[in-house]
Design a protein with these regions (language model features):
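SAM-dependent Rossmann-like transferase core, predominantly class I methyltransferases
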Residues: 149-185
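A short, flexible beta-alpha/helix-coil linker loop
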Residues: 98-101, 157, 302-306
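C-terminal edge-of-domain segments
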Residues: 138-154, 366
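Short beta-strand/turn micro-motifs composed of small residues
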Residues: 8, 256, 337
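C-terminal catalytic and target-recognition region of SAM-dependent MTase-like enzymes
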Residues: 284-287, 291-371
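Non-catalytic nucleic-acid substrate-recognition regions in nucleic-acid-modifying enzymes
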Residues: 1-134
Length: 371
């Protein structure tokens, strides 16, 4: 059994843990900023292909205490790296240290690399490693003097689904968009709307959820090139994911006042394979209205920190709030914003709030209705 670590945005731990449990992995534990679980090497492929809200998948190969560089060196050297890394492997080292005696990240990187080279040198009987072959990205963390180290199976972050070649300014990461849709409890039955859709990330993720389409089917992962992980694991995981897809009619809509953003959103939906069930239109959020008695509205309006001045954002919230109050009572609404005066400008306090981070920006999810 392999222990996997799945980093995630702060505030999304329970959502990611629920995803992992649904995939059938064992000993699932949610901790600050990451999930731990246990599974087989075949589960490495299943996690990468299916996770919507996790940041990446790391196969942990060692966990041990270390308060000195000697303890770090010995702990890393004790790991059987030769079972995973071929002679020509490229093995760069990345990581971080928090609240630990070993606080210098560059020094930790150097010690870890040195320990790995010594272990591999003893096995392969060579002095120099060319590192011209497949990349095996080593990732470590040192938290309160406890070291975790392993191989990054994802490569590029899982938010890179492969459908967004270009975007508009200040895009929302796909993993966070999927989390917002999940928090709204959207399942594909009711209308779904995003009146500030930008490059279309939230409606596209809603469509992937409605169709139960795995988000990682259209991209590559670093672990697909690892010699010890059979190609059949990836093919089986992809087949399993495709067998679970739904095919139906969905009412998913995105609007934005910027015509260029709408063009980009349509192109991204086509790349994601959901252009048959998502409509994008040039529209003013201040005039948004729907007559359907039930629906889901999930949106990420400008915060007034990057795209527009704070006063402009507040006026936008006021006009959008007036339009929102014309919706039937059965609508569930989630708005992601970092603006501390959002509720006052919007014209109604949230029924519930949840703290999240959009990149480095601390935000609240303002929830209205039965969510």
């Amino acid at each position: 059994m392999i222990t996997y670590e799945i980093p995630c945005l702060l505030g999304l731990e329970k959502l990611v843990a629920d995803e992992v449990k649904r995939l059938g992995l064992q000993d699932v534990r949610a901790e600050n900023g990451h999930i731990l679980c246990r599974g087989s090497w075949a589960d490495c492929a299943r996690l990468n292909i299916n996770l919507r809200c996790g940041a990446r998948v790391i196969a942990l190969l060692g966990q041990f205490p270390a308060q000195s560089f000697e303890e770090l060196f010995q702990g890393v050297r004790a790991i059987a790296w030769e079972e995973f890394l071929p002679q020509d492997a490229a093995f760069p080292v990345k990581g971080y240290s928090i609240s630990s005696q070993l606080h210098s990240v560059p020094a930790c990187q150097s010690i870890i690399k040195k320990a790995m080279v010594e272990r591999l040198r003893a096995h392969y009987g060579i002095e120099q490693f060319p590192e011209t072959g497949t990349k095996y990205q080593v990732r470590f963390s040192v938290f309160k003097d406890q070291v975790s180290i392993g191989l990054d199976a994802s490569g590029e972050g899982l938010y890179k689904r492969g459908y967004r070649a270009v975007g508009v300014e200040a895009p929302l990461r796909e993993t966070l968009a999927a989390a917002l849709v999940t928090l709204s409890r959207y399942r594909g039955r009711d209308p779904f709307c995003d009146p500030f859709c930008g490059s279309g990330t939230i409606p596209i993720e809603a469509a992937l959820i409605a169709k139960n389409r795995a988000p990682g089917l259209d991209r590559r992962f670093d672990a697909q090139r690892w010699a010890f992980l059979p190609a059949e694991a990836w093919m089986d995981a992809a087949d399993e994911a495709q067998d679970r897809e739904f095919h139906g009619q969905y009412d998913i809509w995105g609007g934005d006042i910027d015509p260029r953003a709408v063009d980009i959103a349509r192109d991204n939906a086509r790349k994601a394979g959901v252009d048959d069930c998502v409509r994008f239109e040039v529209a003013d959020a201040g005039k948004f209205h729907r007559d359907s008695p039930y629906g889901h509205l999930v949106t990420n309006p400008p915060y007034g920190e990057r795209l527009m001045e704070r006063q402009e954002a507040e006026e936008l919230y006021r006009t959008f709030g007036k339009a929102w109050r014309t919706l039937p009572a059965g609508w569930r609404t989630l708005v992601l914003s970092s603006h501390t005066e959002f509720e006052r400008c919007f014209g109604r306090p949230a029924d519930r709030k949840r703290k999240l981070y959009n990149g480095m920006i601390k935000c609240d999810v303002f929830m209205y209705g039965n969510v």
